[in-house]
Amino acid sequence: MFNIRVMRMGQGVEWALHACHLLAALPPGSSLSSGQLAEFFALPAPYLSKHLQALSRAGITASVPGPQGGYRLARSPGEISLLAVVEAIDGSASAFRCTEIRQRGPASLPQSSYRHPCAIASAMARAEAAWRRELEAVTVADIMATVGRRAPAAASVARTWLARAVGANPELGETGGPADSALPPERN
């Protein structure tokens, strides 16, 4: 009857954020196929591919054609906010839609009595604005730094996997560039 949207992000948001995190660690000029990304996260490739295409349409990732093609970030990790990824996957529509039910039923008043916005709608709008501000303030680079501090072993494993996936040798330091800074070395 009513088009009510629950403020809940789809699983594609999680998948897309993790994919961006991994793509941020790629050596310069490298890309990962949707199949490689799906393998890394043990996700169904067709569904992940759909989300990667949405990220490309939003200008967050770039599709690299050819047999060695795949996806890479279209911008630096510091320029990609979590909100941009969320909106690329789930859209930017407001999570709450007031239908003004206060103006219906036996206690409703004449239209002119409703000079102020609905208090519930106002509270929900403030909450959503705060949520959006927080997501806009955090970038993929911020996530990379946090993961490096909180889970250095996972970052090391990811670096090694990436180096193998793109044909570099991590023991010889061939990953270079953003990969080394995006996934910090192990430390306590």
Regions found by a protein language model. Give the residues of each.
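C-terminal regulatory/oligomerization modules of transcriptional regulators
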Residues: C98-N188
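Short amphipathic alpha-helical elements of helix-turn-helix/winged-helix folds
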Residues: A19-L26, A88
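Beta-hairpin "wing" of winged helix-turn-helix
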Residues: G59-Q68, R72-A74
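A short alpha-helical element within helix-turn-helix/winged-helix DNA-binding domains
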Residues: S31-A42
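Short, intrinsically disordered or compositionally biased N-terminal tails of bacterial proteins
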Residues: M1-M7, N188
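Canonical helix-turn-helix DNA-binding module
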Residues: A42-T61
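Short helix-capping/hinge SLiMs at alpha-helix to coil transitions
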Residues: A25-G29, R75-S76
